[in-house]
């Protein structure tokens, strides 16, 4: 249920107006992040979410609601309410582990997602790369960063192998191991894009695990594994730049030192791979 309001509600106003019988579960935070919290009434649980990036346009949060509204409940939480700065979705019971599942199981989840109807908006990386450059700390903007940005601008994004709905933030912390199978949470970056971009973006432990994931996916998708791996590799420079830029952007936004460390590590990876 989308609900429009020009004035953002406080947490207490949200609960009293829309969920008067529910109460926050203050001792529970498994699988929750950012400003999310859990509410409960007679065994029914919802997750109340806020945008992770307070500076992102409201349209990005609305797109997340629309994506969840059309996805099957077997892979994503169903949304119940959207309004300015708030979204309420089903809580997915299960375990959030610190490591990825078996590659064949994960490949099955991603392949099933990629068979769903497209969301209706494309993921384009170049505008994000330029935004992160513009919004980063000027003292951190180097000639090398600008040179790589111009190189990607000239090259243009790889032509999609197959265009499908993507999650685009697949890592262990966004996977719920439920009794009915794997499910994905945190759909804030979802959109339509190349299946190889999704596979390239998975936060894997090492190259061997990555190759196995791609091979397992290729078997399901009836694509030659070598062809799919080549396409995945074409996206690597784009994704490394995306990660580095995002970490720089978040550093300036939050002042959190972990983002500087992550950015520096990603820049080192780019130097190794150039």
From Swiss-Prot:
Catalytic class of the enzyme: transferase
A GO MF label: ATP binding
GO biological process, one term: thiamine metabolic process
Pfam families (alphabetical): APH (PF01636)
Pathway the protein acts in: Cofactor biosynthesis; thiamine diphosphate biosynthesis; thiamine phosphate from thiamine: step 1/1
Reactions this protein catalyses: thiamine + ATP = thiamine phosphate + ADP + H(+)
E.C. number: 2.7.1.89
InterPro entries xref list: Aminoglycoside_PTrfase (IPR002575), Kinase-like_dom_sf (IPR011009), Thiamine_kinase (IPR014093)
Transmembrane intervals: none
Alphabetized UniProt keyword annotations: ATP-binding, Kinase, Nucleotide-binding, Transferase
Function (record text): Catalyzes the ATP-dependent phosphorylation of thiamine to thiamine phosphate. Is involved in thiamine salvage.
Annotated HAMAP family: Thiamine_kinase
Family the entry assigns: Belongs to the thiamine kinase family.
Protein name: Thiamine kinase
Native organism taxonomy: Bacteria, Pseudomonadati, Pseudomonadota, Gammaproteobacteria, Enterobacterales
């Amino acid at each position: 249920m989308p609900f429009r309001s020009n004035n953002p509600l406080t947490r207490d106003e949200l609960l009293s107006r829309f969920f008067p019988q529910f109460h926050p579960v203050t001792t529970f935070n498994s699988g929750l992040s950012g400003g999310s919290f859990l509410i409960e009434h007679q065994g029914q649980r919802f997750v109340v979410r806020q945008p992770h990036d307070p500076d992102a346009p409201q349209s990005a949060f609305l797109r997340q609601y629309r994506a969840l509204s059309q996805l099957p409940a077997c892979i994503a939480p169903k949304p119940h309410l959207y309004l300015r700065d708030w979204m309420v979705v089903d809580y997915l019971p299960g375990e959030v582990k610190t490591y990825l599942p078996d590659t064949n199981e994960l490949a099955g989840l991603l392949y099933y997602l990629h068979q769903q109807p497209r969301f209706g908006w494309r993921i384009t990386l170049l505008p994000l790369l330029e935004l992160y450059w513009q919004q980063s700390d000027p003292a951190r903007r180097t000639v090398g960063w600008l040179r790589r940005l111009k190189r990607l601008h000239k090259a243009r994004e790889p032509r999609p192998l197959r265009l499908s709905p993507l999650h685009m933030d697949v890592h262990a912390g966004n996977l719920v191991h439920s009794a009915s199978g794997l499910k994905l949470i945190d759909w804030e970056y979802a959109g339509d894009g190349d299946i190889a971009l999704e596979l390239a973006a998975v936060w894997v432990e090492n190259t061997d695990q990555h190759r196995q994931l791609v091979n397992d996916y290729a078997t399901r998708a009836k694509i030659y594994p070598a062809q799919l791996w080549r396409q995945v590799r074409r996206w690597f420079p784009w994704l490394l730049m995306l990660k580095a830029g995002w970490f720089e952007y978040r550093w300036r936004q939050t002042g959190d030192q972990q983002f500087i460390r992550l950015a520096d590590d990603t820049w080192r990876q780019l130097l190794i791979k150039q």
